Swiss-Prot record:
Superkingdom of the source species: Bacteria
Gene for this chain: xseA
Keyword Cytoplasm in annotation: yes
Pfam family, one: Exonuc_VII_L
Protein name as it appears in the record: Exodeoxyribonuclease 7 large subunit
Subcellular location(s) of the protein: Cytoplasm
Binding partners and assembly: Heterooligomer composed of large and small subunits.
Biological function: Bidirectionally degrades single-stranded DNA into large acid-insoluble oligonucleotides, which are then degraded further into small acid-soluble oligonucleotides.
Length: 449
């Protein structure tokens, strides 16, 4: 029989185990890798679990340590953790006190995703592509794996909704290191060919590593350069990629993507055409009916029932013009008859002879008066000319010189008129009636003025 003193209380055992945990150097600082689980962000200390495929451990990160984490924790994020193992006495559970935490694997990818997302958003690329899709597309390009369920779902949906749409598959690698380059190559090929109304790019679900090619910057920029609307259908509805932000539309599934590019089904289109046909027929019927009413009203109008009234006033005006024309012609003929009678009377022979004699006398008298006037004018002009010649002769410099006067010039022929024009030692020329005399200035003396 075991002594009662050998039984330990739960508290005692828990305290003992806690001391063991705290004293064990291997548990004082442990390095773990795991996936975050049961995480819900709180104010202050953070509680969550770390798990792998076979085990799970509770974790606690105090406020001071958590404030140093530069990224947001998310459910399922793989992390590298440094901490110590301790036992929580009230519940008897051991847990990890996390002192340092950083992303690992998917966590690192998530951090890269956030960085690229912020970069592209700052460039305004997420708000750039908001182009509308055509109601009745003719050609749509699909960039995806040729063997996956994505293309099958798209083809099935299009065949059901809008079978006249031409789908063109551009097969691409959608997972792995070569996927991003393959996607960019196919997008550039679509842009070069041209003529497509829209592009669907996508793949099925998977881990973040599987979906990572659709988070590559080169793929995002290739999508930005596409000249037609882009529909993204990557992963499941809960998955979000950079491609989703860049695309004009995001579809949760390949079926939804096919529905987006075929907004109007063929049946809807045919029904709409039928409705438009009915509206067109009704509109034409109404127009014809209205036209018939107008024709009937026109047939009953005065213009058609009494057409003579249209040109009554013109007939009256023609009559007035005719009367005025006849009166004008009558007056002109009467005046012509009068002038003819006058001319005839003036052509009488005796009257003509008398007129000729009178004209001859008039011409003779005019000629005599003209001769007298011409002789008087010539005599007057001759006298005036002789007087002018005599006056000019008296004013001639030669006449003046002939009376003993002279004029003086310098070597250049400039006339020297006053004392100021002369210079001492200057050679001058004195002009007289029959020649000139050279002289030299030796003195200057002002006599008056």
């Amino acid at each position: 029989m075991v002594d009662a003193s050998q039984y330990l209380s739960v508290t005692a055992l828990t305290q003992y185990l806690k001391r063991k945990f705290d004293a064990d150097p291997y548990l004082a600082k442990v390095y773990l890798t795991g996936e975050i689980s049961n995480y819900r962000k709180r104010v202050g200390n953070q509680y969550f679990s770390l798990k792998d495929d076979h085990a799970k451990i509770g974790a606690l990160m105090f406020r001071n340590a958590f404030s140093k984490v530069q990224f947001d924790l998310e459910e399922g994020m793989k992390v590298l953790v440094v901490g110590r193992v301790s036992l929580y006495e009230p519940s008897g559970e051991y847990r990890l006190i996390v002192e340092h935490l950083e992303p690992d694997g998917v966590g690192a990818l998530y951090q890269a995703f956030e960085q690229l997302k912020k970069k592209l958003a700052a460039e305004g690329l997420f708000d750039r592509n908001q182009r509308p899709l055509p109601l009745f597309p003719k050609r749509v390009a699909v960039v995806t794996s040729p063997s996956g369920a994505v293309i099958q779902d798209i083809m099935t949906t299009v065949a059901r909704r809008y079978p006249i749409l031409q789908l063109t598959l551009f097969p691409a690698v959608v997972q792995g290191d070569q996927a991003a380059d393959s996607l960019v190559k196919r997008l550039n090929q679509i842009k070069t060919i041209g003529g497509f109304d829209a592009v669907i790019i996508g793949r099925g679900g998977g881990s973040i590593e599987d979906l990572w090619p659709f988070n590559e910057e080169k793929v995002a920029r290739a999508l930005v350069d596409m000249p037609m609307p882009v529909v993204s259908s990557v992963g499941h509805e809960t998955d979000t990629t950079i491609t989703d932000f860049i695309a004009d539309r995001r579809a949760a599934t390949p079926t939804a993507a096919a529905e987006i590019v075929t907004p109007v089904t063929l049946i809807d289109a045919l029904n709409r055409i039928s409705e438009d046909r009915v509206r067109l027929v009704n509109a034409m019927h109404n127009r014809l009916k209205n036209a018939a009413i107008r024709v009937q009203r026109s047939a009953q109008s005065v213009v058609l029932t009494q057409p003579d009234r249209l040109y009554d006033q013109y007939v009256q005006r023609v009559d007035q013009f005719q009367q005025r024309l006849q009166q004008s012609m009558h007056n002109r003929l009467r005046d012509a008859d009068h002038r003819l009678a006058m001319a005839t009377s003036q052509l009488d022979g005796r009257q003509l002879f008398i007129r000729l004699v009178n004209l001859q006398r008039q011409v003779t008298g005019d000629r005599h008066r003209l001769d007298q006037a011409m002789r008087g004018l010539v005599k007057t002009k001759r006298q005036a000319f002789a007087s002018a010649v005599s006056g000019l002769d008296h004013l001639s410099p030669l006449k003046i010189l002939g009376r003993g006067f002279a004029y003086v010039t310098d070597k250049q022929g400039q006339m020297l008129k006053s004392l100021s024009d002369y210079e001492l030692d200057q050679d001058i020329h004195i002009h007289v009636a029959d020649g000139q005399v050279g002289a030299h200035v030796t003195t200057k003396e002002k006599t008056h003025g």
